[in-house]
Structures are given as structure tokens and as C-alpha cells.
């Protein structure tokens, strides 16, 4: 039981961080980025490259993988999604076009990385491969570090959204786009920055994952996109707190099902999600 509580919480912390990025992108831009997991995969590979080739501590590599993927996300929003906003005549048209664009991005990023690495799975960075006892349960230290860092990053993001000018501009853009423009907020710039930050958060989560999981491949992205979608739907679309609560709920469901049979993990997660949505269609914190 202690093992379930600890390991479920560790997974929940990482899942929450992944979902916070996706929820931010959707909340501000109204684009559901189903290529979100590819940014996580890129963060994993960047961390792995710097660790194996240059001996860079995976925690230090956060300041490398994050900015690189932030810039990539920023450019993708400006070059792809901003153009789609301008040429789409309705919200429904933008939704369908952006969905197709996200599918395209998924395959492009996957295939570029697969071509570079020849599709060979990477083995997790051998970082802090020792265990410590928590309430009599041995827990790998790298998993604890990954979980704690995920929580810290999520809390920092919350503080940024609540108490900084960029956070205020993001919230104004979400709540009243026309009013935000009237007071001088460049909502297109806010869209780009928000999308970039969402990609950055996914990359940081990917850096955490490569510390604790082996067999990272160019094709892991969709799995974590589906997990992030489950988290934000459960917590409530557009709700930051919902992402945190939903992340821990899905983390426990995921870990328990993983212990029972790894082949049914995602099926169990989505079955759990469907049952809860029947009871509460808008999620825990949906409005």
C-alpha cells in the first residue's frame, strides 16, 4: 500500500506537469495541441544527448532543453497556427485545420528524430541510481528528484500566471480577448508565448522521464498526449488546479493498472475517465 501511495504520487506529479503545459496552450489559444507529447519526447532526447555526450547533469540540462523547445514551440505557433487563425473563417474551421496541423507536426517530429537516431530506443540516463527508504518502502532517488522538480516547476508556473504581468495578460486574453486588445495587449504575441511555454513544460517533463524510464523512443509522444488529455478532461478544460488534481488521480490509476497488467494501462485510465465524466461531465473544476 505504501508503495502504491508513493509511486502513484510520483507519476501524478509528472503527469500534472505534462498536463499543465497542454492546458495552458488550450486555455489561451483554444487550440488542442495533440502534438504535445512530441515536445516531451524532444526534451527527453535533448537531455539524453547532453548527458551522454557531454556529461551534463540531467537537472542542469533543464535550462538547455526547456529554452530550445520553447523557441521551437514559439516558431510553430507563429508560422503554423497564427496563419491558420488568420485564414479560418470560423472557430469550427480553425479547430479542424489546427487538428490536421497537429497530426502533421506529430509525424514530422517523430520521423525527424527517428531518422537522426535510426529509431533506436534510448536508455534512461543513469542518474542517482540509488534507493532511499520512505516509510519502509525503497524508492529510487531519481524518481523522488523527478517528482519534486515537477511539483516545483508546476508551482512556479502557477505563480507566474497569478502574479506577473505576462500571467495577467494571458488570463485577460483567455477571459476577454477583445477587451485585452483594447487595453493594449497583443493577443497574438500572448498566443505565441503561451504555446512556447506549454512546449517548454512538456520538454521539462520529458527531461524528468528520461531520468527514470528506459526505452524512450521517437514514438512515445502520443501515449503522453493521451495521458495529458485524460488529466485535463478529468480536472476541467482550462483549469490549472484541475490539471494538478487530475494529474495525481490519473497517476494513481495508471500505477495501479501498470502493476496489474502493463498492456491494459491506457484502457483502464480512459475507462476511469469515462465513468467519472458520466458523473461529472465538466470534470472536477470545469465551468
Predicted regions located by residue number:
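Membrane-interfacial amphipathic/re-entrant helices at transmembrane-helix boundaries
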Residues: 1-18, 46, 58-61, 88-97, ...
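Inter-helical junctions in multi-pass inner-membrane proteins, predominant
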Residues: 1-7, 160-165, 194-232, 254-263
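Single transmembrane alpha-helix segments in multi-pass membrane proteins
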Residues: 2-53, 82, 88-92, 236-237
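Alpha-helical transmembrane segments within multi-pass membrane transporters and channels
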Residues: 55-105, 245-250, 280-281
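Helix-loop-helix "hairpin" substructures at the membrane interface of multi-pass membrane proteins
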Residues: 138-216, 240-246
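Cytosolic-side transmembrane-helix boundaries in multi-pass membrane proteins
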Residues: 175-178, 182, 186-189, 261-287
Amino acid at each position: 500500500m505504501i508503495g502504491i501511495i508513493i509511486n502513484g504520487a510520483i507519476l501524478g506529479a509528472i503527469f500534472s506537469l505534462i498536463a499543465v503545459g497542454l492546458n495552458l496552450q488550450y486555455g489561451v489559444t483554444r487550440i488542442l495541441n495533440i502534438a504535445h507529447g512530441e515536445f516531451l519526447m524532444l526534451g527527453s532526447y535533448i537531455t539524453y544527448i547532453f548527458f551522454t555526450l557531454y556529461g551534463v547533469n540531467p537537472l542542469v540540462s533543464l535550462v538547455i532543453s526547456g529554452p530550445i523547445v520553447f523557441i521551437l514551440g514559439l516558431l510553430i505557433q507563429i508560422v503554423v497556427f497564427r496563419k491558420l487563425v488568420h485564414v479560418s473563417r470560423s472557430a469550427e474551421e480553425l479547430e479542424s485545420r489546427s487538428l490536421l496541423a497537429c497530426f502533421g507536426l506529430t509525424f514530422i517530429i517523430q520521423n525527424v528524430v527517428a531518422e537522426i537516431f535510426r529509431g533506436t530506443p534510448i536508455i534512461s540516463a543513469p542518474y542517482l541510481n540509488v534507493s532511499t527508504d520512505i516509510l519502509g518502502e525503497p524508492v529510487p532517488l531519481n524518481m523522488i528528484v523527478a517528482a519534486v522538480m515537477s511539483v516545483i516547476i508546476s508551482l512556479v508556473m502557477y505563480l507566474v500566471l497569478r502574479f506577473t504581468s505576462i500571467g495577467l495578460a494571458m488570463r485577460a486574453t483567455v477571459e476577454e480577448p477583445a477587451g485585452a486588445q483594447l487595453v493594449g495587449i497583443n493577443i497574438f504575441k500572448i498566443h505565441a508565448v503561451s504555446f512556447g511555454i506549454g512546449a517548454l513544460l512538456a520538454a521539462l517533463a520529458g527531461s524528468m522521464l528520461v531520468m527514470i524510464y528506459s526505452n524512450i523512443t521517437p514514438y512515445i509522444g502520443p501515449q503522453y498526449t493521451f495521458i495529458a488529455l485524460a488529466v485535463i478532461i478529468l480536472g476541467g478544460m482550462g483549469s490549472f488546479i484541475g490539471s494538478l488534481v487530475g494529474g495525481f488521480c490519473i497517476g494513481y490509476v495508471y500505477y495501479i493498472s501498470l502493476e496489474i497488467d502493463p498492456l491494459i494501462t491506457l484502457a483502464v485510465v480512459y475507462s476511469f475517465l469515462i465513468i467519472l465524466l458520466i458523473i461529472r461531465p465538466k470534470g472536477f473544476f470545469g465551468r
